[in-house]
From Swiss-Prot:
Function description: Accelerates the degradation of transcripts by removing pyrophosphate from the 5'-end of triphosphorylated RNA, leading to a more labile monophosphorylated state that can stimulate subsequent ribonuclease cleavage.
Domain Nudix hydrolase: 6-149
Superkingdom of source: Bacteria
Cofactor field: a divalent metal cation
Keywords linked to the UniProt accession: Hydrolase
GO biological process: mRNA catabolic process
Motif Nudix box, residue numbers: 38-59
Gene: rppH
Statement: the UniProt record of this protein carries the keyword Hydrolase: yes
Gene Ontology molecular function, alphabetical: mRNA 5'-diphosphatase activity
Name this protein carries in UniProt: RNA pyrophosphohydrolase
Entry EC number(s): 3.6.1.-
SUPFAM superfamilies: Nudix (SSF55811)
Length: 175
């Protein structure tokens, strides 16, 4: 499904742990890393697509995560000309994406990149929050920067509470 401007509707998924780190996934058989993402099927809402992609790409179900935020607007990136499939109709020139920030509620061991016969990823790791902006392929960098900036106000308190808990002499206030 390609829109009138040539963009494929898509969802992107940022999964964070309780320390505010984000899941960074290695594309199958490649040396490139990215967040999970995937197309929205006809008749599917963005949220439904997000849960489907979440299972297909990282083996997690709705019960394994909690939605913390979603981008207010669709974010777009253009594909480099060398990646555009000019022989398809309609021609897809890029992706327009709705992004979701999820908190992992299960154990790391529940993450499974092998739920599909054609997996998207063959490895993953936790990285610091801003790391993906510097490391993602260049044509996605602006979208990643915008996503992470929009979600930062939600994730930063997670990092601060972890830092406080790990500080010698820190005591949680009660009641």
């Amino acid at each position: 499904m390609i829109d009138d401007d040539g963009y494929r509707p898509n969802v992107g998924i940022v999964i964070c742990n309780r320390q505010g780190q984000v899941l960074w996934a290695r594309r199958f058989g490649q040396h490139s890393w990215q967040f999970p993402q995937g197309g929205i099927n006809p008749g599917e809402t963005a949220e439904q697509a997000m849960y489907r992609e979440l299972f297909e790409e990282v083996g997690l179900n709705r019960k394994d995560v909690r939605i913390l935020a979603a981008t207010r607007n669709w974010l777009r990136y253009k594909l480099p000309k060398r990646l555009v499939r000019w022989d398809t109709k309609p021609v897809c020139i890029g992706q327009k994406q709705k992004w979701y920030l999820l908190q992992l509620m299960c154990n790391d061991a529940d993450i499974n990149m092998q739920t599909s016969s054609t997996p998207e990823f063959d490895g993953w790791r936790w990285v610091s929050y801003w790391y993906p902006v510097r490391q993602v392929v260049s044509f996605k960098r602006d979208v990643y920067r915008r996503v992470m900036k929009e979600f930062a106000s939600v994730v930063m308190p997670l990092q601060e509470s972890t830092t406080q808990r790990n500080t010698p002499g820190y005591r949680r206030k009660r009641g």
